[in-house]
Amino acid sequence: MSMPILKKENIVLHARVENKTEAIRLAGQILVNNGYVEDSYIDKMFEREALTSTYMGNFIAIPHGTEDAKQFVKHSGISIIQIPDGVDFGDGNIVKLLIGIAGKNNEHLEILSKIAIVCSEVENVETMIKAATEEEILSILNEVN
């Protein structure tokens, strides 16, 4: 059975996190709780972050698992965490929108590409950071599904 890559339940608005670790764990836990990945995927998200930061600029980070994490992915999916106050991702990089990604097979590349296109428009990012409802974020990222 196919699941939507992004659904309302994958979005957390007005999150308050203490640090990057807590933010990544939350992004992964949403994917676990909604049936996209196994628990072990979260460890692989931390491994990826240790290799290289997933901070992308424009207040966005896109944490995802390492190449060998695919075995823990049940369905492709993304989680969105809005952090209006921001969280430090190191080197002075502040993240206000965290997009956790899990891709089955090589689907993560297509998902990343679509997200990159949407997020290259600063207005889209600002709208998602200020969004009052999950629907506002869904409407901007609807082409990811």
Curated annotation (Swiss-Prot):
Modified residues (Phosphohistidine): 64
GO cellular component: cytoplasm; plasma membrane
Active-site feature positions: 64
A Pfam cross-reference name: PTS_EIIA_2
InterPro entries: PTrfase/Anion_transptr, PTS_EIIA_type-2_dom, Sugar_PTS
Any GO molecular function: kinase activity
Subcellular location: Cytoplasm
Keyword terms, alphabetized: Cytoplasm, Kinase, Phosphoprotein, Phosphotransferase system, Sugar transport, Transferase, Transport
Principal location listed in the UniProt entry: cytoplasm
Domain spans labelled PTS EIIA type-2: 4-144
TM ranges: none
Keyword Transferase: yes
GO biological process assignments: phosphoenolpyruvate-dependent sugar phosphotransferase system
PANTHER family membership: MANNITOL PERMEASE IIC COMPONENT, PTS SYSTEM MANNITOL-SPECIFIC EIICBA COMPONENT
Job of this protein: The phosphoenolpyruvate-dependent sugar phosphotransferase system (sugar PTS), a major carbohydrate active transport system, catalyzes the phosphorylation of incoming sugar substrates concomitantly with their translocation across the cell membrane. The enzyme II CmtAB PTS system is involved in D-mannitol transport.
Domain text: The PTS EIIA type-2 domain is phosphorylated by phospho-HPr on a histidyl residue. Then, it transfers the phosphoryl group to the PTS EIIB type-2 domain.
Protein name (database record): Mannitol-specific phosphotransferase enzyme IIA component
